[in-house]
Regions:
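Periplasmic-binding protein-like
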Residues: 91-93, 154-162, 219-222, 269-282, ...
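Flexible loop/hinge segments that line or gate small-molecule binding clefts
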Residues: 161-202, 307-319
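An alpha-beta-alpha
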Residues: 206-244, 346-364
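Short beta-strand elements in bilobed, periplasmic/extracellular small-molecule ligand-binding domains
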Residues: 118-138, 219-220, 230-260
């Protein structure tokens, strides 16, 4: 832990005696000098070592216990816990406020995967904590809480649900000795590993599926780059037209409804017979537009829709859902944190390929938290 990010320093005053004692004892646990399951010094020994009052030492020991570093075992004394937080408490950071209009289907799927992993780990097992509204940095209560958790070494590693551009020059990116991993669409220049959602596999598999249905005229609705799709469209013997390609401003997702309606109002010989929706946050709007137009699915239009899976997603709609299993994403992130904690340099990029719903509905393998 670097002193420049110590919480007491952040608020402009030196740490008091209690927190000095806590910080030193915590360092000894984190360094392994006091290993998991090892006896913890008695309160009398701590009083003698630091020359502190019984009240100060009692308060310090009680707080270390509440943090999860130590536990009493009756007459046997006090011991370092077998699962101290610096080894078993992972933090997942969401850029935006939970439940806000910026909260996405991906965030929901990842949150559900986290809840399931915590349920399976049990009350005394490793845990994944979530922190939201990170983009507001010091204005966010979660940011301030997590900053203190990090500098006081109460976190095993940080998992950024998206690239953490807003967190530059903050302890969450600057503090030494903290394993980190980010989830992103592409490899990044961050000095820590990335779990990448493989867009190449999404493009290839969606068009291969539609070609297999005999479809040849493909439209796109959603955030996409035409230059990335054009080679794959051509490779599958398909065609598209400029007015079938509709990049959407995700700040106004409802615009997808009118676009979908218009696509199916074109003359029959100028109408697509296949549609790829490239963001799951648009799907409801697209389907509303198609319903208003009276489009018959899949007879008139076959759809591949992007999806973030969490093991709970189901759909009776006549479309194919293709995307990324949030449980698999989470498991990869946890594994990369653990790899770093073991002192091993992991691969810079761990790609997560796109899968169809029927390929991951048996449940995916759950994250190995330890």
């Amino acid at each position: 832990m670097s002193d420049k990010f110590a919480p007491a320093t952040l608020v402009g005053r030196p740490p008091d005696r209690k927190h000095q004692i806590m910080r030193q004892l915590r360092r000894e646990i984190v360094s392994g000098a006091l290993a998991p399951g090892a006896p913890f010094p008695t309160r009398e020994a701590i009083i003698n070592r630091f020359g502190a009052s019984p009240g100060t030492v009692n308060s310090a020991v009680d707080e270390l216990r509440s943090e999860g570093f130590i536990e009493p075992r009756g007459r046997l004394g006090t011991f370092v816990t077998r699962n101290p937080p610096h080894l078993t408490r992972y933090a997942v950071l969401f850029a935006v406020e939970r439940g806000s209009n910026q909260w996405t289907g991906y965030y929901t799927a990842l949150s559900n995967a986290i809840a399931e992993a915590n349920r399976l780990a049990g009350e005394n097992g490793p845990a994944i904590a979530t922190y939201s509204n990170m983009h507001r940095t010091w204005l966010s209560r979660d940011f301030r809480t997590l900053t203190e958790d990090v500098v006081e070494q109460r976190i095993a590693g940080l998992i950024f649900a998206t690239s953490p551009y807003d967190l530059r020059e903050t302890p969450l990116l600057e503090e030494d000795g903290v394993p980190r991993v980010a989830v992103a669409a592409l490899a990044s220049d961050w000095p820590f590993p990335t779990v990448g959602l493989d867009g190449v596999s999404f493009r290839e598999r969606s068009l291969e599926y539609l070609t297999g249905l005999g479809r040849r005229r493909v439209a796109l609705i959603g955030p996409h780059r035409e230059t990335e799709w054009a080679p794959v469209i051509a490779a599958n013997g398909m065609e598209t037209r400029p007015y079938w390609l509709h990049p959407i401003n995700m700040a106004a997702p409802e615009s997808a409804r009118g676009i979908a309606h218009l696509l199916t109002r074109l003359p029959a010989d100028d109408r697509p017979d296949a549609l790829v929706v490239t963001d799951d946050n648009l799907l409801d709007h697209v389907l509303a537009g198609l319903l208003a137009a009276g489009t018959r699915l899949p007879e008139e239009l076959a759809i591949v829709a992007h999806c973030n899976f969490d093991g709970t997603s189901t759909s009776a709609l006549p479309l194919a859902r293709l995307g990324y299993d949030a449980r698999r994403v989470l498991a990869a992130c946890i594994d990369l944190v653990n790899t770093q904690r073991r002192g091993v340099n992991p691969a810079a990029l761990t790609p997560i390929p796109a899968q169809f719903a029927w390929e991951i509905d048996p449940p995916a393998e759950e994250p190995a938290l330890i």
